[in-house]
Amino acid sequence: MSKIIGIDLGTTNSCVYVMEGKDPKCVTNAEGGRTTPSIVGFTDKERLVGEIAKRQAVTNPEKTVFAIKRLMGRQASSPEVKKWADHCPYPIVDGKGGDAWVEIEGKKYSPSEVSAIILQQLKKDAETYLGETVSEAVITVPAYFNDSQRQATKDAGRIAGLEVKRIINEPTAASLAYGFDKKANEKIAVFDLGGGTFDISILEVGDNVVEVRATNGDTFLGGEDFDNAVIQYLVEEFKRENGIDLSADRMALQRLKEAGEKAKKELSTAMETEVNLPFITADQNGPKHLMVKISRAKLEKLVEDLVERTKVPCQKALKDAGLTAADIDEVILVGGMTRMPLVQQKVQEFFGKEPNRSVNPDEVVAMGASIQGGILAGDVKDVLLLDVTPLSLGIETMGGVFTNLIERNTTIPTRKSQVFTTAADNQPSVSIHVLQGERPMAADNMTLGRFELTGLPAAPRGVPQIEVTFDIDANGIVNVSAKDMGTGKEQSIQITASSGLSEEDIEKMVKDAESHAEDDKKKQALIEARNQADSLIYTTEKSLREVGENVDAALKSDIEAKIEDLKKVQDSDDPETIKQATDALAQASHKLAEQLYAQQNAGAEGAEGPEGAANAGAAGADDDVVDADFTEVKDEKK
C-alpha cells in the first residue's frame, strides 16, 4: 500500500511531509529545499514550477502565475479578485460560470488547473524521496475556506493524479502536529497568518484527541498584502523623486515584488534595510535607479491596518468557543508572516501571553496533514480529530430570508433535517436554493447550488411536507436532499464548486495534465540522450588525441566519421535517433579500446625476456647467501 502524503498547498510556498514509521518527515524537493514556491512559469517549451519558476519571473512576468490560491473558488467579479487583479502582472479573466481564471498566451487556465501543476511537482518530489509511486494525499485548506474553495482544491488534486483522501483545515493540521503525543489537556489558539489567508482556530488538545471548538478568519489577508503595501510605498517614493509611475511597468513591478518581499523579511531581524534596484526604468535622460531606505518603524506603519484586521476574527472565535483570552493555555504561531515582530506583539497583547514558537511555522501544517494521512492509513492509532464547519449552511425561504440549518462551528461530519412547506396553492415544484454564510438575507450569502423537487401533488399552500436534509462529510463538503413526505419523491444534489468545473472539465484537465507529465518524461529522455552523446563525443575525441598515431588508420577514420554523424543529430528532438548514433559510436570506441589493450599486452610480453633475466640473476645471487643463527636479546630494563 502506497503512503498517503500530507500537502500544505500554500499561497506563497508549499510543503510535503510523509509518515515514516511513527515520525513525520519532510520531503525535500529537487533543489534540496524543504518548501517549494507556489509559482508556475509558462515558457514556449515547458511549464516551470517552484524556485526555477520564481527565478525567471522578472523576465517573464505576464506568464508567471503566483498566489493562485487567492482565486480558488472565486468569481472574477468579486471585489477581492478585482483588487488582486490591480497588483497582478498576469491577466485574470472570466472563466466558466464567471469564475476567476488566468489567461496565458490566449489559453485560459482555472485555478484548480494551475494548482494541479504545483501538486504534480510535489507528487513527483515525494515519489523521488520515497522511491515509490504516490497516488493518495491529504491536502490542507484555510479553515475559513467555503465549500466552493474546498471543492476547487479537491479538483486540483484529482487533476494532478492524486486521490484526495481528506481535506483538512490548516490550523487543525497545525494543532495535530503540536498535540501529537501530548498527554496534558490544553486549550490552544492557532494563529495562522500565511501568504494569502488568515485563520484563527480555538481547539482543545490532549489524550490523543484534537477537538476544534471554533474557527474564524479572512481568506483575503496575508503576506501578499504586506508585500503590496511595501511595493506601493516604493512606487510612490520613486514617483516623488523621478516623476515616473512604475505601476504600469509589469517587469518593474515584478522586480519591486521580489525586493519588497526581501525587505519585509529582512526587517523581521534588522531595524533598517535598503532597497537598491539599478536600471529599474529609463527616460529620455537615460537609465533610472531606485534606492530607498526602509526602517522597521516605517514598515510597521505601512502594514498596521493589515495586522489590526486579525483582531476581529480572534474576538469572534473566542466568543463562539465560549472562552476568553485568559482561558487559552497556548497560542501557536503558524505561517511565515508570524515571524514579523509587530504580528507577535499584537498577538501577545490580545491573548495576554507570550506566543509559543516551538513549531516551524512553514512546515507544521504539512506535518499535521501527514499525521492525518497516517491516521487514515491506520499507521497512527488512537488519535481522534474533531473538526468543524466554518460557516453556517441553510436555504432561502419565503421573503428572501436565509434559514439556517447547520450553525457555524458545528462538529463534522454531521447531518441535519428540517421540514418546510409550499408558499402557494397547487404548487407543482419547489426550488431549493442552498446557501453558506452568516447574513440574515439570502442575497447577502454565498450560493452553493440550486435544485428542483418536482411532481408535487396539487394541494393548498402549507399542506405539503418537504423535508430538507443537509449532510456534511469529514472534508467539509456538502450534500443536500429534499423529500416530499407525502409521495416519498426525493431529489438530491452534491454541492460542487458553484459555477465551477464540471465532470467533463475535470476529465479533460486530468488528460491534459497526464499528457504534460508524458511530455516531461520525453523531455527528460531527450536531455539524457543529448548529455550521453556529449559525454561520449568528449571522451572518444580525447582518446584519439592521446593515442591517435598508434591506432589503425581505417578504425580511426571510422570513429571520426561516427563522431561527425553523432554531432549532426545531437541537437535533434528525437532521442531515439541520438541513441542510435550514440550506440554506433560506442561500438566503434569499444574497438578502439580493444586495439589499445592488445597493443599494451603485446608490449608487456616483449619486455618479459630481459626482465626475466634480471630476475634470474637476482635469484642466482641468492645462492651465495649464507644463513646465520641469531639470538633475540630482550632489554628487561623498563
Swiss-Prot record:
Record field: compositional bias (Acidic residues): 621-630
SUPFAM superfamilies for the chain: Actin-like ATPase domain (SSF53067), Heat shock protein 70kD (HSP70), C-terminal subdomain (SSF100934), Heat shock protein 70kD (HSP70), peptide-binding domain (SSF100920)
UniProt keywords, alphabetically: ATP-binding, Chaperone, Nucleotide-binding, Phosphoprotein, Stress response
Residues recorded as bearing Phosphothreonine in the entry: T197
Induction data: By stress conditions e.g. heat shock.
GO function terms (MF aspect): ATP binding; ATP-dependent protein folding chaperone; unfolded protein binding
Start and end residues of each stretch annotated as Disordered: 596-638
Coiled-coil regions listed: none
The keyword ATP-binding appears for this protein: yes
Biased composition (Low complexity): 598-620
Presence of the UniProt keyword Chaperone in the record: yes
Pfam family, one: HSP70
Function: Acts as a chaperone.
Family membership: Belongs to the heat shock protein 70 family.
HAMAP family: DnaK
Protein name listed in UniProt: Chaperone protein DnaK
UniProt source species: Maridesulfovibrio salexigens (strain ATCC 14822 / DSM 2638 / NCIMB 8403 / VKM B-1763)
Lineage start: Bacteria, Pseudomonadati, Thermodesulfobacteriota, Desulfovibrionia, Desulfovibrionales
